[in-house]
Curated annotation (Swiss-Prot):
The modification Phosphoserine is found at S269. Its main location: nucleus. Probable transcriptional activator. Binds to the consensus sequence 5'-AGGCCY-3'. InterPro entries: Transcrp_activ_Zfx/Zfy-dom (IPR006794), Znf_C2H2_sf (IPR036236), Znf_C2H2_type (IPR013087). This is Zinc finger Y-chromosomal protein.
Length: 801
């Protein structure tokens, strides 16, 4: 016989108590004291042969109780004078795992103290009465009881059980009575719970399970539990059908709930309950999940952190039952936790409430998971009719698609199942998929949302170059795959938008429109040449016009330098060689590039080179004397306050007042915007398939389609619930709720809440001061960056440091 199992068989009413040790069992007057160690396994007499771990006793009429740990057979203590009716007048303390042997006569005990782990096998008395204040530990095993009257703190529970000796399994006394053909009603009210933490408040746990004649669960509206089942044949042994695995999660509920629990039917045809999972037994036969579900009431004073996106169902949830198996990751973590707890189970002994003992037995494994909620894996065998609840580890099964949203069935107080969507990261549950998606933004490290999306298909990526390569793949589509042909040139395209853009090229080629100047008789075929003519000739900003080419300039020095191109004059000569130049900046560039070895001393600030150290030191004094204004945000120094303000605006602010009309991108300065607009020219135009909008950047086209041709407003304000298409629009809207001061420009309609951005706007737009001068041509600029861009563009040989 296996050490982890024991078999109880009926015999004649002749019993022996075999204690551990010679002095463990004794009789003192009216008291009988029996002391047995924990984990006692029982064997019984079958005809004349008795086998207990290959041990045959001399007396075949005795019952041997053997300690498995020490493998010792203890002497027998036989009780002959036993009364038919037992009346207990004193307080009786029944410890864990009590199992009694056969009792054939009446026993009258004035005071009885029974230690842990006493096996109660056959009690044939007609009635047993116990007074109040009875403390019962986790698992008390009773079998073959004719009539039991159980009083627990004033709550009387009666159970009538048909006598069937030694056929009961090991179950919990408070919830399940083994191998019963009659009805057992148990009231769990008033059961004291051993609180380990004083600050957690009272916690009441109820487990409601009922079985009908066929071994199915039935709901009983009373506060007790009804069981009516027969256990004649174990179907698991006959046809090989094994029970399914049910995963139980216990949630929080208000302490004032009247409904202690029950069961609810789940019909497979209902669409909201379509969450069943086919279960495989040991013979790989498919077994459909049960049609009824158990729910439980758990009161807990602790409350989780408030989440605005969580569905308000925390006070309505009793127990969640997921029919099926865990995924591999969760099962592995659970197995590790159970193994670690089993290692320490021999050292830790705790008193558990009776209601918990029915679900978890003697072990506290799996009572709490990582999120703080109670959970367990229960193995329920309906076919035996005993309602046994034992630990069971499910098989690992690969999920078909990891991206599918897992759902759970929640049984509410009204008895109807609710479908919720749990977060796979923190365990919170939501009533809709939309709330779950919004909640997932709180876990940015787990988001897999791609940044760029193709406008022609569902392709997404986080890299811009990958999207460009993908767009090129659309161009290489075979002509046979629904290619559209151009009527003018016969060129094929993959979609109508590309064909429409291509036809615009034919229209531009066929047009011979001449652009005329409205101030003079100048005309040209290109609009860009006309714009250049207007700026050079008819603009007040370029009053100095070249008589040779008509180009205009702002300053006379610029016109003078330009005239040297037509005359060929080169007044600037190199002192190290015969090189001559029409511009001084070109000469400096020549000296730096060709004669850098002769001038090896360089300034650390402006990178100018000098022939000796004295020149470098004298030059450094210019930088030290000029910079007296220190930036409070960094080490930058400026020669005047206006330069310092420009530095703060351009470096330490995030406002971008200058917007591009094509892509709505913002810039600090107009020069940056002008450079950006020039980048749009000369690129291939992408036509919107819904309107006449076209743009060179495909990402701008995607943004246009989302903002103009879609009704979805994904970005919503948390205060007023107003929706916006883009995130920057939501940020602008949120400033209206902040109550901050709004700065309004007196020259235009510009307004902002940023003081530095407002100053930058006034300086860059409504100021004509040009404090930054070019060292080579003395041209003035508003900002140092504009001056550097000018040097790069017009003084190429000099370059920037």
């Amino acid at each position: 016989m296996d050490e982890d199992e024991f078999e109880l068989q009926p015999q004649e009413p002749n019993s022996c108590f075999d204690g551990i040790g010679t002095d463990a069992t004794h009789m003192d007057g009216d008291q009988i004291v029996v002391e047995v160690q924990e984990t006692v396994f029982v064997s019984d007499v079958v005809d004349s042969d008795i086998t207990v771990h290959n041990f045959v006793p001399d007396d075949p009429d005795s019952v041997v109780i053997q300690d498995v740990i020490e493998n010792v057979v203890i002497e027998d203590v036989q009780c002959s004078d036993i009364l038919e009716e037992a009346d207990v007048s004193e307080n009786v303390i029944i410890p864990e795992q009590m199992l009694s042997s056969d009792v054939t006569e009446e026993v009258s005990l004035a005071h009885c103290t029974v230690p842990d782990d006493v096996l109660a096998s056959d009690i044939t008395s007609a009635s047993m009465s116990m007074p109040e204040h009875v403390l019962t530990s986790e698992s008390v095993h009773v079998s073959d009881v004719g009539h039991v009257e159980h009083i627990v703190h004033g709550s009387v529970v009666e159970a009538e059980i048909v006598t069937d000796p030694l056929t009961a399994d090991v179950v919990s006394e408070e919830v399940l009575v083994a191998d019963c053909a009659s009805e057992a009603v148990i009231d769990a009210n008033g059961i004291p719970v051993d609180q380990q933490d004083d600050d957690k408040g009272n916690c009441e746990d109820y487990l409601m399970i009922s079985l009908d004649d066929d071994g199915k669960m039935e709901h009983d509206c009373s506060s007790g539990m009804t069981m009516d089942a027969e256990s004649e044949i174990d179907p698991c042994k006959v046809d090989g059908t094994c029970p399914e695995v049910i995963k139980v999660y216990i949630f929080k509920a208000d302490p004032g709930e009247d409904d202690l629990g029950g069961t609810v039917d789940i019909v497979e045809s209902e669409p909201e309950n379509d969450h069943g999972v086919e279960l495989l037994d040991q013979n790989n036969s498919i077994r459909m999940p049960r049609e009824k579900m158990v729910y439980m009431t758990v009161n807990d004073s602790q409350q989780e952190d408030e989440d605005l996106n969580v569905a308000e169902i925390a006070d309505e949830v009793y127990m969640e039952v997921i029919v099926g198996e865990e995924d591999a990751a969760v099962a592995a973590a659970a197995a590790t936790t159970v193994h670690e707890q089993e290692m320490d189970d021999s050292e830790i002994k705790t008193f558990m409430p009776i209601a918990w003992a029915a679900a978890y037995g003697n072990n506290s494994d799996g009572i709490e998971n990582r999120s703080g909620t109670a959970s367990a894996l229960l193995h329920i065998d309906e076919s035996a009719g005993l309602g046994r609840l034992t630990k069971h580890k499910p098989k690992k099964r690969r999920r078909p698609d990891s991206r599918q949203y897992q759902t759970a069935i929640i049984i509410g107080p009204d008895g109807h199942p609710l479908t919720v969507y749990p977060c796979m990261i923190c365990g919170k549950k939501f009533k809709s998929r939309g709330f779950l998606k919004r909640h997932m933004k709180n876990h940015p490290e787990h988001l897999t949302k791609k940044k760029y999306r193709c406008t022609d298909c569902d392709y997404t990526t986080n890299k811009k170059i990958s999207l460009h390569n993908h767009l090129e793949s659309h161009k290489l589509t075979s002509k046979s795959e629904k290619a559209i042909e151009c009527d003018d040139c016969g060129k094929h395209f993959s979609h109508a938008g590309a064909l429409f853009t291509h036809k615009m090229v034919h229209k531009e080629k066929g047009a011979s429109k001449m652009h005329k100047c409205k101030f003079c008789e100048y005309e040209t075929a290109e609009q860009g040449l006309l714009n250049r003519h207007l700026l050079a000739v008819h603009s007040k900003n370029f009053p100095h016009i070249c008589v040779e080419c008509g180009k205009g300039f702002r300053h006379p020095s610029e016109l003078k330098k330009h005239m040297r191109i037509h005359t060929g004059e080169k007044p600037y000569q190199c002192q190290y060689c015969e090189y001559r130049s029409a511009d001084s900046s070109n000469l400096k560039t020549h000296v730096k590039t060709k004669h850098s070895k002769e001038m090896s001393f360089k300034c650390d600030i402006c990178l100018l080179t000098f022939s000796d150290t004295k020149e470098v030191q004298q030059h450094a004094l210019i930088h030290q004397e000029s910079k007296t204004h220190q930036c409070v945000h960094c080490d930058h120094k400026s020669s005047n306050s206006s330069d310092l303000k420009r530095h703060i605006i351009s470096v330490h602010t995030k406002d971008y007042p200058h917007k591009c009309d094509m892509c709505d991108k913002g810039f600090h300065r107009p020069s940056e915007l002008k450079k950006h607009v020039a980048a749009h020219k000369g690129k291939k135009m992408h036509q919107c398939r819904h309107c006449d909008f076209k743009i060179a950047d495909p990402f701008v086209l995607s943004r246009h389609i989302l903002s103009v041709h879609t009704k979805d407003l994904p970005f919503r304000c948390k205060r007023c619930k107003k929706g916006f298409r883009q995130q920057n629009e939501l940020k602008k809207h949120m400033k209206t709720h902040s109550g901050r001061k709004v700065y309004q420009c007196e020259y235009c309609e510009y307004s902002t809440t940023d003081a530095s951005g407002f100053k930058r706007h006034v300086i860059s737009i409504h100021t004509k001061d040009y404090p930054h001068r070019c060292e080579y041509c003395k041209k003035g600029f508003r900002r140092p960056s504009e001056k550097n861009q000018h040097i790069t563009r017009h003084h190429k040989e000099v370059g920037l440091p």
